[in-house]
C-alpha cells in the first residue's frame, strides 16, 4: 500500500511529529511504500536545521533527514507556513535579503500542490 503522511506538529513540544516518524518507520518495516511526508503549519519546524536537542535526546530533525536519504521519502514543507515561521532555503533567504538559510538538507519548500498530488496518488494519507 502507498502512503503519505501530513505532520502539523513541531519537532519538539507535542507528540505529533514523533508519532508520525514512528509510524513512517513502521510502514517501511512492514513493506509499505511511503511516498512523501508533508509538513504543514507548526510542522515546518521539523525542517529547521538550527534545532539542537540535548545530546541525550532524540534528534527528530536529523532522523527525518535520514529517512529521506535511506528510503527516498520526499520531505515537503509548506512554503507559506515555513516563511511565516522563519524556515527558509537559500533561494528564499536571498530573495528576502536574509543573511542565511536554515532549511535542513533533504527537505524541500513546496506548495499545497505537493499535498494535493500525494492525496491523489497514494492509497492512504495519514495526518498527525
UniProtKB/Swiss-Prot annotation:
Transferase keyword on record: yes
Biological process terms in GO annotation: tRNA wobble position uridine thiolation
InterPro entries in the record: DsrEFH-like (IPR027396), Sulphur_relay_DsrE/F-like (IPR003787), Sulphur_relay_TusD/DsrE (IPR017463)
This protein's UniProt keywords: Cytoplasm, Transferase, tRNA processing
Encoding gene (name): tusD
Major enzyme class: transferase
Domain of life: Bacteria
Gene Ontology terms, MF aspect: sulfur carrier activity; sulfurtransferase activity
Active-site residue numbers: 78 (cysteine persulfide intermediate)
EC number: 2.8.1.-
Free-text function comment from the UniProt entry: Part of a sulfur-relay system required for 2-thiolation of 5-methylaminomethyl-2-thiouridine (mnm(5)s(2)U) at tRNA wobble positions. Accepts sulfur from TusA and transfers it in turn to TusE.
Name this polypeptide is given: Sulfurtransferase TusD
GO cellular component: sulfurtransferase complex
Family to which the UniProt record says this protein belongs: Belongs to the DsrE/TusD family.
Xref: Pfam families: DsrE
Cell location: Cytoplasm
Complexes and interactors: Heterohexamer, formed by a dimer of trimers. The hexameric TusBCD complex contains 2 copies each of TusB, TusC and TusD. The TusBCD complex interacts with TusE.
Heme as UniProt keyword: no
